Structures are given as C-alpha cells and as structure tokens.
UniProtKB/Swiss-Prot annotation:
Protein family per UniProt: Belongs to the phosphoglycerate mutase family.
Site (Transition state stabilizer) location in chain: 206
Protein name: Phosphoglycerate mutase-like protein 1
GO CC terms in record: cytosol; plastid
Top-rank taxon: Eukaryota
Known role: May play a role in carbohydrates metabolism.
Active-site annotation: 23, 135
Lineage of source species: Eukaryota, Viridiplantae, Streptophyta, Embryophyta, Tracheophyta
Amino acid sequence: METGAGIGLYPLHRCKTIYLVRHAQGIHNVDGEKNYKAYMSHDYFDAELTQLGWKQVDSLRKHVHSSGLHKKIELVISSPLMRTLQTAVGVFGGEGYTDMSDVLPLMVANAGNSSRAAISSLNCPPVITEESCREHLGVHPCDQRRSISDYQFLFPAVDFSLIESEEDKLWKADVRETIEELAARGKKFLNWLWTRKEKEIAIVTHSGFLFHTLNALQNECHPDVKKEICGHFANCELRSMVIVDRSMLGSDSSVTDYPGKIPKGIDLPSDAVVDDNNIKVE
C-alpha cells in the first residue's frame, strides 16, 4: 500500500504540543489598525487590554474549559508585557480570587486599568514569563516593557525569575529589530522549550513574533498546511501545534514506551526464522 506524500513517524517523547495564543485586543490595536503611525505614540507604552479585549479573553477562557484544554496544559509561558500577562492569567488562571494569606493571586484587582477582580492562582497551571517570546523589539513604545517589580506587584503569583534585568534592556527607541533577528529569536525560543519537562505548553505572545517565527519554520509543509500555520493571528486566537525534536535537544526517555520481554522469553520475529535449507519461513 502506498503512503501519502509527507507522512512520517516520530517518537512521542520527542514531541511537544504547544498552544499558541496571540494576546487579546490592546489599546494600541484600535488606533494602530487605522493608522500605523499610532504605534509610535508614547500614549500606548506597554499597552493594556481594552474592554473588548477582556471580552475576548472571556470567550477564549470558555473555549479552553469546554474543550478540556485546561486539564491538559501543564505550563503557561507569557511574554512579559501587560497585554500578554492580562491575557495569560485571564484565559488560563483560576476562578475568582478569595483573599488568603498563604496564596497569592495571579493578578490583583484592576491591574492595568482592567476593572477586573483579582484572579486566583489555584487549580490552574503555573504561569511564567520569558523575554525571548516578546514582540518585535524597538521603536514602538507599545512593545516596551515596564520594570519587573511593577509587574510583580500587579501579578504576584506569576514567575518572573527567568527575566534577567529589572529594566527593559532589549527595547531601543531608535533601533528596530530586523525580521531575520526576530525569526532567529523565535527559533531560539522554540529550542529552549526542549529544556522544559512539560509536554503541553500554552504560549501567550504577539502577532509579529508568531508570524515571522512560524514563517521561518514552514518550508517543508504542504501549501495548505502553510496557510494553517503561517497566517496572521487574530486577537486572542489559539492554534494548537506539535513541535518535533529533530536535533536531540529533548529527553532521551519516554514515560509511555514499554520495553517488552518482561518476563523474558524467545521472541525471534517470524520473518527472521530460517529452516534447515536456509529458506526464510514467514
């Protein structure tokens, strides 16, 4: 039987499922979609979500729960900007927060002018931040982050330990990251995922980061699959994908494979057996 073009096999323990999410609508998106120059405005420094954006968060959260994804996702990785953090905790965080001295909330009430109640860190995957999945760096104030201590106050249970500097040393007012640099950063981020033990990971990031990273990785895909992978993400869109460890960066062990031959016994395959006349017997 002939196999279809492009069909292949890969060990499960060398694969991860990633759930890619673009942040919900930010205040910069509203004017920026009408006039690109609006992205240059300092009024949109580290832009937060609009009220429509929060409704988009609510809709995606409902889907994540109704589809059962909330039970599968082991880790949430967020770009350390206001709009991605708000999206990450709003979609994947716990239910309404009850003030408890020994449990910090993922988000305090009204963080980033949200007019939202605090969000619980209970019964949800951990949320961590990583700078390498930030938006296109430089020039646009909406893509500049604030100090980490500011975020830690607003998002107490989010883990910021992977961020190396208190202030934003990556964003430059007069230098825009090239597309090639952005795509290379995206590939580096995906390689970094193989240092993580988690197999099902949600990543809350940005349109430019997703578009240029995914377009740099789709060369071997069928044209129809390329369209599925590489098209621009809508606000609060989620796409589920599998990444494969071809470079042997990940674990060499599988938790689901079973070695067999327990108890031990004769198990020579039938097509390897030969009779006295050296004729293969099958």
